[in-house]
């Protein structure tokens, strides 16, 4: 079976309520030097991604677009391994000066951390309680 690596509308957080759900119910947080990732288990059939790049954090539009593009592309390639998560990615101040290669590396580490946290959570949620 061929794995799909598309970034269709089904894998995007689209409305404010989707984003608010992640902010309010974030069970997983991953801090990287230039990114913050928030995630919660998804109620959908696949992982979804939302990227927030505030003008206050990244002044130039082409830099905001570059950051969003890198985050989306990295997610697209890792979405099959992440399990069912709704994820919001937010850059930190100073990200404009970082090279694409460094950002790719930070994104790789973040996906790995999220994957480990989600697996640990699933084991705890599935394991029978000892009463």
UniProtKB/Swiss-Prot annotation:
GO terms for cellular component: ribonuclease P complex. PROSITE patterns: RIBONUCLEASE_P. It holds the Pfam family Ribonuclease_P. It is an enzyme of class 3 (hydrolase). GO terms for molecular function: 3'-tRNA processing endoribonuclease activity; ribonuclease P activity; tRNA binding. Keywords: Endonuclease, Hydrolase, Nuclease, RNA-binding, tRNA processing. GO terms for biological process: tRNA 5'-leader removal. It comes from the Bacteria. It catalyses: Endonucleolytic cleavage of RNA, removing 5'-extranucleotides from tRNA precursor. PANTHER family: RIBONUCLEASE P PROTEIN COMPONENT. Consists of a catalytic RNA component (M1 or rnpB) and a protein subunit. This is Ribonuclease P protein component. The lineage of its organism: Bacteria, Pseudomonadati, Pseudomonadota, Gammaproteobacteria, Moraxellales. The gene is rnpA.
């Amino acid at each position: 079976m061929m794995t799909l690596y598309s970034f269709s509308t089904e894998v995007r957080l689209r409305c404010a309520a989707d984003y608010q759900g992640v902010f309010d119910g974030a069970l997983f947080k991953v801090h990287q030097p230039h990114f913050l990732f928030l995630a919660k288990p998804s109620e959908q059939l696949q992982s979804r991604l939302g990227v927030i790049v505030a003008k206050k954090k990244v002044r130039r539009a082409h830099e905001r677009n570059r950051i969003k593009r890198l985050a989306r592309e990295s997610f697209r390639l890792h979405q099959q391994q992440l399990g069912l998560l709704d994820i919001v990615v937010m850059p930190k101040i100073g990200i404009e000066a970082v090279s694409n290669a460094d950002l790719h590396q930070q994104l790789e580490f973040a996906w790995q951390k999220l994957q480990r946290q989600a697996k640990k959570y699933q084991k705890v949620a599935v394991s029978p309680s000892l009463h």
